[in-house]
Amino acid sequence: MAGKTLYDKLWDDHVVTQRDDGSCLLYIDRHLLHEVTSPQAFEGLQLAGRQPWRLSANVATPDHNVPTSKKERDQGIAGIEDDTSRIQVQTLDDNCKAFYIVEFGINDIRQGIVHVVGPEQGLTLPGMTVVCGDSHTATHGAFGCLAHGIGTSEVEHVLATQCLVQKKSKNMLVRVDGVLGKGVTPKDVVLAIIGKIGTAGGTGYAIEFGGQVFRDMSIEGRMTVCNMAIEAGARVGMVAVDDKTIEYVKGRSYAPKGEQWEQAVAYWNTLHSDDDAVFDAVVELNGAEIEPQVSWGTSPEMVIPVSKAVPTLEQAKDDVQRNDWTRAYQYMGLNAGQALADIQLDRVFIGSCTNSRIEDIRAAAEVVKGRKVAPSIKQAMIVPGSGLVKQQAEKEGLDKIFLEAGFEWREPGCSMCLAMNADKLQPGEHCASTSNRNFEGRQGNGGRTHLVSPAMAAAAAIAGHFVDVRSF
């Protein structure tokens, strides 16, 4: 009998019962909530007269709709100008109080993007099943978790039962060996993976990221990669537990202590795929060949190394891709064969659940230090992923580096990743963004998004256009 993959182990450890149709009822260890996908779920509980099944499993924080300017933030919920956004944040507050659920409110130092806050607080622990009403919940798989997004009706189901009916995915291994070159980051790795397999490449699979590159990678880097497993078509992305994982978790607020810690570590050390485990699909990349990446189109798979030009229709693999590229040229205002350096940028956004942790901010600051934002850039903003990330960055003096260079230093939240708050692109504007999606209108109606790493975004802000950060 073949060994088990990490995904197999996590799945099997959480099966409550298997149903006749092959689906399983899974136990959920951690449920993270935010203001956008939870109101209807809480309303469903109220209408049915139910209470959350296990209060301690649930933790909430507002992130999508919160303002990131200090003036608005200082006013708390009252500072949210948009009526719908304000009501959603207030409703989360009200529901958490009514149901006795822990919430890191809008001006709590622990508030932030839910996928930054969970690991930061030790709410995300190896071996857990973690769900949230947000597609980028795969982020938490960096800790050897089975983590994925759920819909609003499922949010209610988890609140009420602490269980969820799921169908098991197939297993995919994405192995990246070798050593990354200077200026090549985890964001570049995951963009290169998506560029190779496409946004449907992982559909129906749980992806395990393995190989030397991921063994060498920091935990925050692994979070960046797992965050974008969803853009590769998978619902789940994960990395095996190792000493780095355990060290990162140790001492965090919600991490186990004393004898429970020792017991947990003994279990966590089993959370890796067996040597004889068989995967349904294997994808391999050479890390030494990966360059800094820039997305040029309207899908994360429309991505190229910074040294390349916008592809021509002759390079498309089929008619579907030719049609997609033609539409992307038009929406993005680009020409086939155009050099990336010729794209005039308007804004730069460094933040999001993909790249707003302290390592990301340090990487950007290293590029920015002693330089100035180009006069042609209308706005360059740094949005830390949580109040604690912001606090740590300020302790290190990183905020001063950015402010002296002409960046805006913002309050934590999802910000310009998506057009659900005050931070938006205007029609036709090009933005170098460290977020995870470059769909039409994602950052604002008519906005044009280019996905890059924090270092590449910082370099673009200084130059006013895309440059190879390796030359900085």
From Swiss-Prot:
Binds 1 [4Fe-4S] cluster per subunit. GO terms for molecular function: 3-isopropylmalate dehydratase activity; 4 iron, 4 sulfur cluster binding; metal ion binding. PROSITE patterns: ACONITASE_1, ACONITASE_2. Its cofactor is [4Fe-4S] cluster. Keywords: 4Fe-4S, Amino-acid biosynthesis, Branched-chain amino acid biosynthesis, Iron, Iron-sulfur, Leucine biosynthesis, Lyase, Metal-binding. [4Fe-4S] cluster binds at C353, C414, C417. It catalyses: (2R,3S)-3-isopropylmalate = (2S)-2-isopropylmalate. GO terms for biological process: L-leucine biosynthetic process. Belongs to the aconitase/IPM isomerase family. LeuC type 1 subfamily. Catalyzes the isomerization between 2-isopropylmalate and 3-isopropylmalate, via the formation of 2-isopropylmaleate. This is 3-isopropylmalate dehydratase large subunit. It comes from Acinetobacter baumannii (strain AB0057).
